[in-house]
């Protein structure tokens, strides 16, 4: 029989007929496409066209995954990201995406060029001079009174009663909106308004699911004595649990301006939750002097405008988060979801020539500037303009750097070294150094001198720069945070992207509560 090829319209009709034949329960209580964020918003680009790189090939480089490992033993290439390719000519959604992108502000074209003194700083031979570091003045540590507090009270710091009440209100509003559209649905017949006690019980069961993973969600309510976990059926019915998960909401859909409006916020569904977390994380605890900025990837394989593809990550597709964490404990102080290269990031006091990655760093660091913090970043963020600006606001930094960044000394970049050798040059407070172990490592620092230390490996003793040793020690904060969460991750597939991110946020609150 010859193969039959369907047009897009015919395929849509067939798929719609198949969808209508599904069971009523699965249709009504599934995570419907009402909250699907269409790919037509725009195609995000993680590779950061605003980065201060010398050539266009920078956007194609991949970032190294092992920040917590010794950088002298790993690839110094930085991790990039790329959107899932789509064809705007063959797909109407792609055509709408092109129109949407045309309405976005062309900030890259408006950005002024990098000043000459930052593109061509004067580099001189280093002379073991340590920069005049600013004093550390932050009032670090816990900012709340924990006397006589029970373990649950630490979680209540990040999930207080007023926030849970807000989530209940938005969840009930969304449930009523769905019921109004389908008054004869299963949801309309069985829905009762959710209370804060219901929400707490729901979150407790969600947390326990991460501790006791099962292949399918309905298995938590099975009556099979081999697989049965009695607390689930004793506390809530499976239908009620699915209703709560389906209607879980954090903002009112009626307040969304729509994707065609230039003022549309891609993170509208989660914006109240993100703002709340950044507020309570900063109020509850002030980190120690050593901090790090890196990114996490929340696995997600659905259709989403801000979904990223990062080959070096274990879960290559997902939603990217930038996190500022304390190096010693992994406490998450501030987070930011990547929204695309056309998102508006305007941290106060930022120089006009700063690119996207620099703006992200300044936005995360804004509450901690002028206090003497020591920042550690990898080569995705490190640049001469950023480090010089951070030093001017009393925040020295250290990080590996890509060889094609503007302003680096050519003599350091192209220097041929033998294993164990170090070469460096200095431009005022900024030190550029190259170290050869198994491979070349380029680094910039405004914290250290070119001081070296003897390090013993399994087979020999080698001399390493102190800057490299401390980078290896303090850079793994975000990896440490992810390591804490990895045994408790809820990796179950979900259609609705913001619900998967929201469950990650709830678990992040649990982790921070454990740390403090």
Label the predicted regions.
Residues 2-388, 394-405, 448, 490, ...:
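N-terminal initiation segments
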Residues 112-149, 396, 407-505, 512:
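An anionic, glycine-rich sequence signature occurring as long contiguous blocks
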């Amino acid at each position: 029989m010859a193969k039959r090829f369907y047009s897009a319209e015919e395929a849509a009709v067939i798929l719609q007929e198949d969808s209508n034949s599904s069971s009523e329960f699965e249709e009504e209580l599934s995570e419907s496409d009402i909250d699907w964020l269409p790919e037509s918003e725009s195609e995000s680009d993680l590779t950061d066209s605003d980065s201060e790189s010398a050539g266009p090939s920078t956007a194609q480089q991949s970032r190294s995954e092992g920040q917590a490992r010794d950088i002298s033993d790993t690839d110094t290439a930085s991790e990039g990201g790329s959107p899932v390719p789509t064809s705007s000519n063959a797909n109407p959604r792609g055509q709408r995406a092109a129109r949407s992108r045309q309405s976005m502000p062309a900030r890259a074209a408006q950005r002024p060029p990098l000043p000459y003194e930052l593109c061509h700083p004067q580099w001189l031979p280093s002379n073991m001079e340590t920069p005049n570091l600013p004093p550390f003045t932050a009032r670090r540590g816990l900012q709340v009174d924990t006397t006589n507090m029970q373990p649950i009270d630490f979680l209540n710091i990040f999930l207080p009663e007023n926030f849970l009440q807000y989530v209940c209100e938005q969840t009930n509003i969304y449930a009523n909106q769905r019921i109004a559209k389908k008054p004869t649905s299963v949801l309309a017949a069985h829905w009762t308004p959710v209370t804060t006690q219901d929400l707490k019980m729901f979150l407790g069961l969600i947390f326990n699911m991460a501790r006791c993973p099962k292949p399918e969600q309905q298995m938590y309510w099975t009556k099979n004595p081999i697989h049965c976990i009695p607390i689930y059926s004793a506390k809530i019915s499976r239908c009620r649990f699915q209703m709560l998960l389906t209607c879980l909401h954090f903002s009112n859909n009626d307040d969304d301006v729509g994707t065609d409006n230039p003022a549309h916020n891609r993170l509208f569904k989660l914006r109240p939750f993100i703002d709340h977390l950044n507020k309570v994380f900063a109020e509850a605890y002030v980190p120690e002097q050593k901090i790090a900025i890196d990114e996490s990837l929340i696995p997600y394989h659905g259709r989403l405008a801000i979904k990223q593809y990062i080959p070096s990550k274990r879960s290559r597709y997902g939603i990217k988060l930038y996190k500022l964490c304390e190096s010693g404990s992994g406490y998450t102080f501030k987070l930011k979801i990547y929204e695309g290269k056309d998102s508006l990031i305007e941290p106060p006091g930022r120089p006009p020539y700063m690119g996207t990655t620099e703006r992200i760093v300044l936005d995360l660091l804004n509450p901690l500037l002028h206090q003497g913090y020591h920042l550690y970043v990898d080569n995705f963020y490190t640049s001469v303009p950023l480090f010089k600006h951070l030093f001017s606001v009393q925040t020295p930094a250290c990080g590996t750097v890509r060889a094609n960044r503007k302003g680096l000394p050519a003599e350091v970049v192209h220097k041929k070294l033998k294993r164990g050798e170090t070469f460096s040059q200095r431009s005022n407070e900024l030190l550029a150094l190259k170290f050869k172990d198994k491979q070349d490592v380029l680094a910039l620092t405004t914290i250290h001198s070119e001081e070296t230390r003897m390090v013993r490996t399994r087979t020999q003793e080698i001399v390493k720069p102190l800057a490299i040793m401390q980078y290896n020690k303090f850079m793994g904060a975000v990896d440490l945070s992810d390591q804490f969460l990895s045994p408790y991750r809820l990796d179950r597939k979900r259609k609705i992207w913001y619900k998967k991110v929201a469950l990650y946020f709830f678990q992040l609150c649990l982790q921070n509560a454990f740390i403090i």
